């Protein structure tokens, strides 16, 4: 199970594979940040971490972690459909959580799509790692292209 999974930081040469994985995993709608250029910027940011899960030399999962000096955030947890329910997502969360805490984060939050009840169920299953739902917050976003056009 999860012992066969290797987790490590993504290599720049693998960024196109990450974009394909996100499309295949269908965990979130495509975003304006979904590009090789965007991911290249991300992996060169000191507070950012993009981890991949590998089985048999194949990338089967990924997760982004960001630390801004105040809190850690987890984004884009994705596992390819045929590899789900094998402990990969949990392992990625354990690894990204450790990386963000090592950077200095005292609290982590994860963005989870409301449209995916299975994702909410997954995060509920991580209570033993300290994760809990926080109903106090709603998320608001602004895309640069829209902001600049107003």
How should each PLM-predicted stretch be described?
Residues 5, 9-76, 80, 93-95, ...:
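Acetyl-CoA-dependent GNAT
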Residues 77-84, 112-113:
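A short, internal acetyl-CoA/4′-phosphopantetheine-binding micro-motif in the GNAT/acyltransferase core
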Residues 100-112:
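Conserved GNAT acetyl-CoA-binding A-motif
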């Amino acid at each position: 199970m999860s012992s066969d999974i290797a987790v490590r930081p993504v290599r720049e040469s693998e960024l196109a594979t990450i974009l394909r994985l996100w499309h295949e995993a269908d965990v979130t709608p495509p975003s304006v940040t979904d590009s090789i250029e965007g991911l290249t910027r991300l992996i060169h940011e000191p507070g950012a971490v993009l981890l991949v899960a590998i089985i048999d030399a194949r990338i089967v999962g990924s997760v982004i972690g960001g630390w801004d000096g105040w809190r850690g955030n987890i984004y884009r947890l994705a596992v390819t459909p045929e590899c789900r329910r094998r402990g990969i997502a949990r392992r990625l969360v354990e690894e990204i959580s450790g990386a963000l805490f090592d950077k200095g984060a005292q609290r982590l939050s994860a963005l989870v799509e409301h449209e995916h009840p299975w994702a909410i169920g997954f995060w509920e299953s991580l209570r033993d790692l300290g994760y809990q739902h926080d109903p106090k917050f709603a998320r608001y976003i602004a895309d640069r292209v829209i902001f600049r056009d107003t």
